[in-house]
């Protein structure tokens, strides 16, 4: 899988930009705030229908325009894909894949798979559990449409249950019983799929992490949930929801479920979030990203596109070497402010260089 070309109109600081990409390594060089990350953002948006930088689609539209247009042409082993996206300031958007209208975001996912690594991804390890849940949900939605459906349903029912808790009376108590049954059904599936994904990360990630650290470190991922028996997760979750209802009524929110879960990353049996050095935390994120690449490859038979947003400068020479020696079979799009530090690894590879300056791109 690789992107042949990208066409952007009124996207961020680009007026009308058409770009041919190499199926191998593409390097975008320029100072900060020139538009390098905007290119990656457009590709990421074409993959999952969301930006990695903002929750407001209107932020993607050039400030003096009413809409933006993105076209991404993707070469696949079986069938090429042309993804067209129109985003309007009134909040509406229109998406087609090979000229067929997309009604649900789940229909967009899987046409273009990407894995993105940016400096902000350190939050997956360092920050609150929501970042780790978001990581799992995005990666699972890329490869499992059922997961996406059940996640949407779970969040919808969760919101309705929380509203019912705030307006509780004896009649609503029966409604909450129904919500609990539905939450248990969808929540159990989410919990089990997340745990399975972490099992895959453990198998693949351990080998990757050992390569990066020259066998000095062992990494482990462990799902943290109130559910003890995954085989009977639905039944157990229903029991726990009923048990915690009094507390939920006092707090006007649902205290148990996959929306509260987390996962632990440990290196040599030590919690990386609390006790890991900055270097260890970066390596853990690197392991997560490259393990995710392999999981997608194992499931769909093709590597996704790898997006590296100004992260190589954040890595020491050993980690840089690992990254650049691991991308031979993967279309990789790199942004950086200078290539001096990585040029020694790239000179033997098929790579294309682009200079970015104030929304203008020059192929070198």
UniProtKB/Swiss-Prot annotation:
SUPFAM superfamilies: P-loop containing nucleoside triphosphate hydrolases. Keywords: ATP-binding, Cytoplasm, DNA damage, DNA repair, DNA replication, DNA-binding, Nucleotide-binding, SOS response. The keyword Cell membrane does not apply. CDD domains: ABC_RecF (cd03242). Signal peptide: none annotated. Pfam families: SMC_N (PF02463). It is found in: Cytoplasm. The keyword ATP-binding applies. Its main location: cytoplasm. ATP binds at residues 30-37. One of its GO terms (cellular component) is cytoplasm. One of its GO terms (biological process) is DNA synthesis involved in DNA repair. It comes from the Bacteria. Disulfide bonds: none annotated. One of its GO terms (molecular function) is single-stranded DNA binding. The RecF protein is involved in DNA metabolism; it is required for DNA replication and normal SOS inducibility. RecF binds preferentially to single-stranded, linear DNA. It also seems to bind ATP. NCBIfam families: recf (TIGR00611). Belongs to the RecF family. This is DNA replication and repair protein RecF. The gene is recF.
């Amino acid at each position: 899988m690789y992107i042949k070309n990208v066409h952007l109109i009124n996207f961020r600081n680009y007026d009308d930009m058409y770009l041919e990409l190499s199926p191998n390594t593409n390097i975008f060089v320029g100072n900060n705030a020139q538009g390098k990350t905007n290119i990656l953002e457009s590709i990421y948006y074409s993959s999952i229908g969301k930006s990695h930088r903002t929750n407001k689609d209107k932020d993607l539209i050039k400030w003096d325009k009413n809409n933006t247009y993105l076209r991404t042409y993707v070469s696949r082993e079986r069938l090429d894909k042309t993804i067209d996206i129109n985003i309007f300031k009134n909040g509406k958007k229109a998406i087609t894949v090979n000229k067929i209208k997309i009604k649900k975001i789940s229909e967009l996912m899987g046409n273009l798979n990407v894995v993105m690594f940016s400096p902000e991804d350190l939050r997956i390890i360092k920050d609150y559990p929501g970042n780790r849940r978001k990581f799992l949900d995005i990666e699972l939605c890329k490869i499992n449409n059922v997961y996406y459906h059940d996640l949407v349903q779970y969040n919808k029912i969760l919101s309705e249950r929380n509203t019912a808790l705030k307006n509780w009376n004896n009649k609503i108590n029966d409604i909450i019983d129904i919500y609990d049954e539905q939450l248990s059904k969808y929540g159990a599936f989410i919990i089990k799929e997340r745990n399975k994904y972490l099992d895959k990360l453990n198998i693949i990630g351990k080998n990757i992490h050992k390569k990066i650290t020259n066998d000095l470190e062992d990494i482990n991922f462990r799902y943290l949930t109130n559910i003890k028996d995954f085989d009977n997760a639905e039944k157990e979750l229903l029991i726990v929801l009923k048990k915690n209802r009094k507390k939920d009524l006092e707090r006007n929110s649902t205290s148990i479920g996959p929306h509260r879960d987390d996962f632990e990353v440990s290196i040599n049996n030590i919690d990386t979030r609390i006790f890991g050095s900055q270097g260890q935390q970066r390596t853990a994120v690197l392991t997560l990203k490259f393990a995710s690449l392999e999981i997608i490859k194992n499931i769909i038979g093709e590597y996704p596109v790898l997006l590296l947003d100004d992260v190589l400068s954040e890595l020491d020479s050993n980690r840089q070497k690992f990254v650049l020696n691991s991308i031979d079979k993967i279309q990789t799009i790199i942004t950086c402010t200078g290539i001096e530090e990585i040029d020694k690894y790239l000179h033997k590879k098929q790579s294309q260089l682009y200079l970015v300056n104030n929304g203008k791109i020059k192929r070198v």
